[in-house]
């Protein structure tokens, strides 16, 4: 121890120097100071926490708190001398807080650089409430405004730039409100800058750009948040973006002065006008404007690219890593939770809903079309330089956020057990950056269902439901769309869909049974024929028309225009077939009259019941509801009428189709009964039933089920729904009464109101959406009927879709609906894949004759029809080709005879005939197309055979159809085009037909009971153009020829073939292609021949519109060619007939042929696209051509009560409006389109001869159309066509006496050519010169002139001419009779000049058809001599160069060789220079007709011989060239040979060659050959 002390002493014995000691102390002190700094900060934090906890109640406490807040934000503060003013300052701004002596806040002012202090209400409110936290945030915001590296000068410029941007955005918001008077919610969702909240204090300007439905509900109370101008909108509500300026590494030229000039918008959307950027109003700054998100939002790669494209500034660098978009959405949604915690979800989420438990699997890695998964990134801000970029950026962000909202609705923190009972599994997979699918098990069937949601923008989501063809209906696309747009929640929507399906199932107990039956039938592959119908339906379903409300609206419009026609043309046949074939449906609908008492009832029964029914669609007529649905309203009211329409849409087999089908849904019902009835006529009960089931299965059990269930069981409301949708048909008034009287069930259904309520109850939600539905006709088969109504039947639907698509897209589409890419793809697939909903599958299953499918005209027609009907591509149509034939099978009983493609009626070359029939003669297929083919290739056979059969059996219908199936086109055209002329002159025939129509239809049903007919009925709808009501009927008219054996009890001026032009179809088909009408008229005509009705009904409306007619032609009719679904079908018929006749391709495509197609026909021989692609042509077709055809139809219409009145008015329009349209279509087109009817008629007449009847009917129709067109087009085209046509038919079919009588009655305007006269003379002649007017006024050539013509026609008919009064029918009857039958009984129906209801003046036994044909020819010759030619010529010249040579020739060429052949031949025969005679005007025509009559008589003799020869030749070439009928129109069609042939033979042969060759090689060939 001592040693230790010693050492210590020695060590410290020396004293340290003082300086060293001081240094040591300082070191220690410095260390201590350093240590104290942390402690000091800690102490400061503690003091601040204490201050926050203390209550500020004094002046000193308030000032202390303010100083503390300033320090926290790096700002300086000081007090005024009196201590009541506190200043918080920086270099760029300062705050002035005014206090009273008690420490109470008086005011808070903010002063930015060089600005005067401005009071800030928000800061005042926050300080008064002692909300110092928010006050502090304001200070931070103010500091951030100037957070830019640089000096004060740069910061000042940046502030000026931000200020100018804010001023511009504020002005944009004001201008938008001024222009739209938008509500707060509308501003948020649609405003150019959203809902703008100006910068206040430290809070920058914010733009509220999106609010989801759930954002508007108060989580606490569950009450809805009210957004109104008077109340402040919470900043936190919905999605917001802040407007700021921030420093960047790049230099940008930013405006420092406001750029908006003026205070008014440049448009109704609130778009302002900006001044250009100059050096005076802008500066280059190392900064940029930004839209900043409170939290980064998930944005897909595609949207990032769109935004970058908009702003021109990259958002991310090239090395940025993208992540699966669904994963980002999941993170974003889960981060919204107040207590976000880790959740082991594996992209599987659960939702517990009332009564349902859902499990959602988000397939984040699902490959997109490009093979990559949907990827995105989190975006926090978007740079931009100009205020005009803000609206575009917000629109894109809204779109993305809407998509994210739907996907995010599946993301829940709810946890359920995997084995939870009743747990429903759903898979959500992306299809694109804005589209995704939700797959789940069908609520009823053991199959997979898929709902595709396409987020088109922030407020429009298009939904489509895809299910199996035989799956029970679930709900409509529109219903789904409505639900989604209301809630923007997938779980809620899935629950609604399931509940709706349960409701429907509960309401339709028979659905399951029906579904099973249908499935069995499908498995057995029973009636492929029905597949065509379904094919169309499928096509529809394949089509994608958005069902979203917006889409729905468009579709509805489309449907209103085009769907009506479509419904008429396509829907009826298919639906009818289904109904009639299905005993359950039949019993439900009590379809006894039309179907012949029962589905299995004898064809004669239907014929007897016809008086009440009065048309082939008598079934429908019996069913007032069905009639209504099948008639005009189908298009108009369908979507609007039936809010429940969605339900029907639900029935659609393919959701994609469902949209359009919605509108169609309501009407298809009636159509379906109609179709069934007609088919029933042709087929045996078992066959029909099988076909019905098969069709239903093909198109979709749902529709079928619904239809059946609705009508038969407790779901009358469902079926009625379809009916309801179609209840409003105006054109079908007459039919409706018949339907009512005939159908009790229908009466029930007719009680649209009663049904609607039921449907509404069943589909209350759907009903609401139904109005929006564009027409989901996806499940065409069953609901397809309803859909069909909307879309005009299964085919109609498809047509409708196509049309809609075209309309909308030319809409549609229809609903629109479309418009919908996915559905379209589906359609394409469907036509490409037999499994698809589209008709393809069915088509493939149908036993079509390869020739039929491949036949030029048939396949062309099929394609046309498909094109019209469906949006799907040519493949779809091609698939339809078979179906079309199948539809035609109505004519040839495709399904029945399946592979044969044979015309049951015994068409010459069955296979060929069938194809021809299907293309040329089958109304079902597309009257004109079928008819045209028939009239071309098969016409001779059909004409002769059919004509003969017809007198014997249902042939009458076919004859009436246009010389049988062959004359179908002609008939259709003639009925449609000639329909008007027929209406008057043909009215006898028409009326007889109208009245006989039901019989015919029954006949057709008994005769054309073949499933194929039924099945083909769907195609009939397209064909239906002629007979709007019952496409099937129309097709049937063709089908009956194929099937027809039983003679029709009543022949409306229906000289077996002459009947081709059916007054009834005319009545409906006045607008729609007359030919179709004709053809359909006698048979399919339910007061509106299936085709004629559809087109004519449509056209009527169109016609009445005049220009409107054109629109329909081009839009409604133009969709397809005009006439929406039916019109399109009819147009197709007509146009096809025309186009086909005129141009083989057209005929083939039939599409070309919509009267509107006329131009397509000529212009686009292949027509399908032509029609679609030639709206102008469509237009012409609709107005003039359709008008004309309508005229023919009108004649027929006249017999049909609805038609007479409506057709006349529309006819009145026809010549003019129609003509104008034709004209607009192009004189040439008029010829072609007008030719739709003309060509159809003439073409048919000449080409196929479409059995003289067809030919003449066609001629008449053509003439009528031509006349109408001519008058509109300058009278040249029409006259040319009319004359040409008129002459041909006149010569062909109308006896000289008839021609003379017609001339006398019609005057020169009559155009002298009996049959053709109505169109040609009455319509044609009248149309040509003044006649054009006469024609218009007279039911577009038939009405005004027809009365006279009709009376004379009746006389003529009684003479056997059968052509006089009902020029078309007569002619057709006469000529056709001649060509196809030896003799026949014709009922002469005379319509009043004013277009009053027609009366049957007498029943006449047609004298030798050949004579009739010759007579018609003579008359046609007269016509040729008549002014029609001159009128026609100018028109043709006007319309197309091809017509320049000579009106007659030109029209011929334009008209398709058919018209060229028939008309041209006639012209050539009579008037070698068509234009020279045309110039003659009415008087000239009359004189010409007189002289021509003599000449005709002489030529009749020759023609008879030639016709016989030609018939033989045709029979030979018939089978050989269904497609190349053009080579030998005469050969192809005896009738043609008779009407056109004899004309051709009489020196027309050579002449036609030039023009024909010019326009249609094939058609040209025919005349040349002749």
Curated annotation (Swiss-Prot):
Keywords: Activator, Nucleus, Transcription, Transcription regulation. It is found in: Nucleus. GO terms for biological process: cellular response to thyroid hormone stimulus; positive regulation of transcription by RNA polymerase II; regulation of transcription by RNA polymerase II. A motif (LXXLL motif 2) lies at residues 626-630. Residues 961-970, 1217-1228, 1308-1328 have a biased composition (Gly residues). Residues 675-687, 946-958, 1347-1359, 1504-1516 have a biased composition (Basic and acidic residues). Residues 788-801, 832-861, 931-942, 1173-1190, 1276-1287, 1418-1433, 1441-1455 have a biased composition (Polar residues). Residues 1494-1503 have a biased composition (Basic residues). One of its GO terms (molecular function) is transcription coregulator activity. It holds the Pfam family Med1. Residues 592-687, 771-880, 922-1561 are annotated as: Disordered. InterPro entries: Mediator_complex_subunit_1 (IPR051999), Mediator_Med1 (IPR019680). A motif (LXXLL motif 1) lies at residues 585-589. One of its GO terms (cellular component) is mediator complex. Residues 1022-1035, 1066-1082, 1089-1113, 1121-1140, 1152-1161, 1229-1271, 1459-1469, 1536-1546 have a biased composition (Low complexity). The keyword Transcription regulation applies. Belongs to the Mediator complex subunit 1 family. Component of the Mediator complex, a coactivator involved in the regulated transcription of nearly all RNA polymerase II-dependent genes. Mediator functions as a bridge to convey information from gene-specific regulatory proteins to the basal RNA polymerase II transcription machinery. Mediator is recruited to promoters by direct interactions with regulatory proteins and serves as a scaffold for the assembly of a functional preinitiation complex with RNA polymerase II and the general transcription factors. Component of the Mediator complex. This is Mediator of RNA polymerase II transcription subunit 1.
């Amino acid at each position: 121890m001592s040693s230790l002390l010693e050492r210590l002493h020695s060590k410290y014995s020396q004293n340290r120097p003082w300086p060293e000691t001081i240094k040591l102390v300082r070191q220690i002190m410095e260390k201590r100071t350093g240590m104290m700094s942390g402690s000091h900060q800690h102490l400061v934090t503690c003091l601040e926490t204490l201050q926050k906890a203390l209550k500020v109640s004094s002046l000193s406490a308030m000032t202390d708190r303010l100083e503390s807040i300033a320090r926290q934000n790096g700002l300086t503060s000081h007090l005024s001398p009196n201590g009541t003013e506190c200043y918080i300052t920086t270099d760029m701004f300062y705050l002035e807080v005014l206090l009273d002596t008690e420490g109470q806040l008086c005011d808070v002012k903010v002063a930015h650089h060089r600005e005067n202090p401005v009071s800030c209400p928000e800061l005042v409110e926050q300080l008064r409430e002692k909300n110092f936290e928010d006050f502090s945030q304001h200070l931070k915001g103010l500091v951030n405004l100037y957070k830019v590296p640089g000096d004060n000068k740069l910061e000042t410029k940046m502030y000026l730039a931000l200020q100018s941007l804010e001023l511009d955005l504020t002005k944009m918001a004001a201008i938008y409100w001024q222009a739209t008077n938008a509500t707060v919610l509308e501003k948020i969702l649609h405003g150019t800058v959203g809902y703008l909240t100006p910068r206040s204090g430290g809070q920058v300007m914010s733009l509220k750009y999106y609010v989801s439905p759930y954002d508007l509900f108060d989580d606490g109370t569950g009450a809805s948040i009210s957004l109104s101008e008077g109340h402040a909108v919470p900043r936190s509500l919905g999605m917001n973006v802040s407007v700021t300026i921030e420093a960047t590494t790049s230099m940008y030229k930013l405006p420092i002065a406001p750029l908006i000039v003026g205070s008014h918008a440049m448009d109704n959307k609130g778009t302002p006008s900006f001044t250009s950027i100059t050096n005076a109003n802008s500066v280059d700054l190392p900064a940029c404007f930004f839209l900043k998100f409170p939290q980064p939002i998930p944005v897909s790669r595609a949207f990032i690219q769109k935004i970058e494209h908009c702003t021109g500034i990259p958002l991310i660098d090239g090395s940025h890593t993208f992540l699966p978009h669904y994963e980002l959405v999941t993170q974003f949604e889960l981060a919204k939770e107040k207590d976000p915690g880790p959740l082991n979800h594996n992209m599987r989420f659960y939702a517990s809903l009332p009564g349902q438990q859902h499990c959602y699997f988000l397939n984040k890695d699902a490959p997109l079309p490009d093979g990559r998964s949907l990827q995105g990134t989190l975006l926090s801000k978007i740079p931009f330089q100009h205020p005009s970029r803000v609206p575009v950026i917000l629109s894109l962000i809204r779109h993305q956020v809407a998509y994210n909202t739907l996907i995010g609705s599946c993301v829940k923190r709810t946890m359920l057990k995997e084995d939870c009972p009743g747990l429903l599994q759903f898979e959500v997979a992306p299809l694109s950056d804005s589209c995704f699918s939700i797959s789940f098990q069908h609520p009823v069937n053991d199959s997979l269902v898929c709902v595709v949601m396409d987020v088109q923008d922030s407020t429009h989501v298009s939904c489509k439901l895809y299910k199996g063809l035989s799956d029970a209906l679930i709900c409509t696309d529109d219903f789904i769309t409505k639900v989604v747009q209301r809630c923007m929640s997938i779980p809620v929507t899935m629950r609604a869909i399931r509940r709706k399906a349960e409701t429907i199932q509960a309401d339709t107990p028979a659905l399951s049974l029906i579904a099973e039956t249908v499935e069995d039938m499908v498995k057995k592959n029973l009636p492929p024929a029905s597949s065509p119908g379904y094919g169309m339906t499928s096509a529809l379903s394949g089509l994608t028309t958005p069902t979203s409300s917006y889409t729905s609206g468009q579709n509805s419009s489309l449907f209103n225009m085009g769907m009506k026609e479509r419904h008429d043309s396509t829907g009826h046949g298919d639906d009818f077939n289904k109904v009639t074939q299905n005993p359950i449906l039949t019993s439900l609908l009590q379809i006894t009259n039309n179907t012949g008492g029962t589905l299995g009832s004898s064809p004669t029964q239907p014929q007897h019941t016809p008086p009440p029914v009065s048309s082939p669609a008598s079934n429908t007529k019996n069913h007032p509801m069905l009639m209504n649905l099948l008639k005009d309203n189908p298009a108009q009211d369908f979507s609007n009428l039936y809010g429940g329409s969605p339900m029907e849409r639900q029935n659609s087999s393919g959701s994609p189709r469902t949209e359009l089908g919605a509108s169609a849904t309501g009407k298809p019902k009636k159509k379906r009964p109609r179709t069934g009835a007609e088919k029933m006529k042709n087929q045996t009960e078992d066959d029909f039933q099988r076909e019905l089931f098969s069709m239903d299965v093909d198109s979709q059990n749902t529709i079928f089920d619904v239809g059946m269930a609705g009508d038969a069981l407790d779901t009358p409301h469902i079926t009625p729904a379809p009916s309801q949708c179609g209840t409003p048909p105006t054109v079908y008034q007459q039919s409706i009464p018949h339907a009512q009287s005939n159908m009790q069930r229908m009466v029930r259904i007719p009680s649209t109101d009663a049904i609607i309520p039921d449907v509404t109850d069943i589909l209350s939600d759907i009903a609401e959406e139904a109005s929006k539905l564009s027409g989901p006709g996806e499940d065409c088969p069953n609901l397809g009927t309803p859909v069909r109504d909307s879309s005009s039947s299964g085919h109609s639907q498809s047509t409708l879709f196509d049309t809609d698509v075209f309309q909308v897209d030319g809409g549609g589409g229809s609903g629109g609906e479309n418009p919908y890419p996915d559905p379209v793809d589906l359609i394409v697939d469907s036509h490409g894949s037999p499994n698809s909903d589209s008709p393809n599958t069915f088509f493939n299953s149908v036993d079509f004759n390869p020739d039929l499918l491949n036949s030029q005209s048939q396949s062309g027609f099929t394609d046309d029809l498909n094109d019209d009907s469906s949006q799907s591509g040519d493949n779809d149509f091609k698939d339809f080709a078979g179906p079309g034939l199948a539809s035609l099978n109505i004519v040839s009983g495709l399904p029945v005879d399946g592979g044969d493609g044979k015309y049951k009626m015994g068409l010459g070359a069955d296979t060929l005939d069938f194809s021809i029939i299907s293309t040329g003669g089958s109304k079902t297929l597309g009257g004109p197309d079928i008819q045209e083919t028939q009239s071309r290739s098969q016409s001779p056979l059909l004409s002769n055979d059919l004509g003969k059969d017809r007198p014997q059996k249902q042939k009458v219908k076919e004859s009436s159809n246009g010389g049988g199936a062959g004359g179908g086109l002609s008939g259709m055209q003639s009925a449609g085009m000639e329909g008007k002329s027929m209406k008057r002159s043909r009215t006898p025939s028409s009326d007889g037909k109208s009245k006989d129509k039901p019989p015919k239809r029954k006949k057709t049903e008994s005769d054309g009971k073949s499933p194929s007919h039924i099945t083909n009925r769907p195609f009939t709808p397209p064909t239906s153009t002629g007979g709007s009501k019952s496409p099937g009927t129309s097709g049937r008219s063709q089908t009956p020829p194929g099937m027809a054996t039983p003679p029709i009890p009543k022949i409306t001026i229906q000289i077996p073939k002459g009947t081709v032009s059916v007054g009834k179809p005319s009545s409906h088909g006045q607008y729609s292609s007359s030919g179709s009408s004709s053809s359909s008229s006698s048979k399919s005509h339910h007061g509106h021949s299936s085709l004629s009705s559809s087109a004519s009904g449509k056209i009527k409306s169109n016609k009445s519109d005049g220009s409107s007619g054109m629109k329909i032609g081009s839009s409604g009719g133009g969709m397809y060619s005009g006439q929406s679904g039916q019109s399109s079908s009819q147009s197709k018929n007509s146009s096809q007939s025309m186009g086909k006749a005129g141009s083989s391709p057209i005929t083939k495509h039939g599409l070309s042929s919509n009267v509107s197609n006329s131009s397509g026909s000529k212009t686009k021989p292949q027509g399908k696209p032509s029609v679609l692609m030639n709206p102008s042509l469509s237009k012409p077709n609709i107005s003039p051509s359709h008008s004309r055809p309508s005229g023919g139809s009108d004649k027929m219409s006249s017999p049909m009560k609805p038609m007479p009145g409506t057709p006349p008015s529309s006819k009145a329009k026809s010549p003019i409006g129609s003509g104008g349209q034709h004209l607009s279509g192009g004189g040439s087109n008029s010829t072609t389109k007008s030719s739709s009817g003309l060509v159809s008629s003439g073409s048919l007449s000449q080409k196929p001869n479409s059995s003289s009847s067809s030919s003449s009917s066609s001629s008449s129709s053509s003439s009528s159309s031509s006349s109408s067109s001519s008058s509109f087009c300058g009278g040249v085209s029409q006259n040319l066509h009319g004359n040409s046509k008129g002459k041909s038919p006149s010569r062909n079919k109308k006896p000289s006496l008839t021609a003379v009588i017609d001339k006398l009655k019609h005057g020169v305007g009559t155009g002298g050519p009996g049959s053709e006269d109505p169109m040609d003379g009455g319509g044609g002649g009248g149309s040509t010169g003044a006649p054009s007017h006469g024609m218009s006024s007279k039911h577009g050539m038939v009405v005004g002139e027809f009365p006279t013509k009709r009376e004379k026609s009746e006389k003529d008919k009684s003479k056997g001419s059968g052509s006089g009064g009902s020029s078309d029918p007569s002619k057709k009857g006469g000529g056709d009779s001649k060509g196809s039958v030896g003799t026949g009984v014709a009922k002469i129906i005379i319509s009043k000049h004013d277009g009053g209801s027609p009366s049957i003046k007498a029943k006449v036994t047609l004298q030798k058809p050949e004579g009739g044909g010759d007579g018609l020819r003579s008359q046609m010759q007269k016509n040729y001599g008549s002014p029609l030619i001159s009128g026609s010529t100018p028109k043709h010249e006007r319309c197309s160069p091809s017509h320049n040579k000579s009106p007659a020739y030109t029209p011929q060429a334009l008209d398709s060789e058919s018209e060229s052949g028939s008309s041209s031949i006639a012209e050539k025969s009579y008037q070698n220079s068509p234009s020279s005679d045309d110039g003659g005007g009415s008087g000239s025509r009359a004189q010409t007709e007189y002289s021509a009559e003599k000449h005709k008589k002489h030529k009749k003799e020759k023609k008879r011989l030639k016709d016989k020869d030609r018939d033989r030749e045709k029979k030979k070439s018939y089978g050989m060239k269904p497609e190349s009928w053009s080579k030998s129109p005469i050969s192809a069609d005896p009738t043609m040979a008779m009407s056109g042939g004899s004309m051709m033979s009489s020196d027309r042969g050579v002449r036609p060659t030039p023009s024909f060759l010019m326009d249609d090689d094939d058609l040209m060939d025919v005349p040349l050959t002749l």
